[in-house]
Amino acid sequence: MSKLVVCLTGMPGAGKSTIVSKLKEEGYETFSLGDGVRAEAKRQNLEPTGANLGKLMLELREKNGPGAIAELLKESIKESTHQIIIIDGVRSIHEINVLKETGNVKLLAVDAAPDTRFNFLRERKRSDDPLTREKFEERDNREIGVGLKEIIELADESIENNNVTINQMVESATKIFQKWIE
């Protein structure tokens, strides 16, 4: 049986990483495309600011093609002994095409209202999170520019992260995975 590769997508702050961290606690194997970029930034001795990571993401795609970020994780996914792999932060069809080389890919979109996302990102305080509405909108536009809007529209399923608990959101995602396995 080939691996089920569940790719989570959605705008920054929609709740993808929150779902992934809970699924990891439940024993799922998880990978983050953003972590791949952060690891590359560390390798290049770049400070992991939003501007630096965004610039690096674009440079990697320009230099190595639009699926470059997924290529950073492809071998690790192939080598995994888990039958279900969760991928956080897929942004383009090109990344999906790379990931299809590792197993049966399904795409789950996580959706949240802009105010919800902005407030979450401000509270999360990761080094690349925007602290102003202007930076938030710049980041959204950059993500849309690499194909995020199109990939969200192609999702096999989607879940809402507006006025729900983390557990409700994870439960919704898990039910979808189970349906995909059957």
What are these regions (language model features)?
Residues M11, L23:
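P-loop (Walker A) phosphate-binding loop of NTP-binding proteins
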Residues K16:
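Conserved lysine of the Walker
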Residues I19:
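Hydrophobic positions on the alpha1 helix immediately C-terminal to the Walker A/P-loop
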Residues E29, K106, D156-E157:
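Well-ordered beta-strand positions
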Residues E29-I86, V90-N97, K135:
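ATP-dependent small-molecule kinase phosphotransfer cores
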Residues G67, R124-S172, I176:
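Small-molecule kinase domains that catalyze NTP-dependent phosphoryl transfer to phosphate-bearing small molecules
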Residues D88-G89, L99-K125:
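Conserved phosphate-donor/acceptor-positioning beta-strand/loop module used by diverse small-molecule
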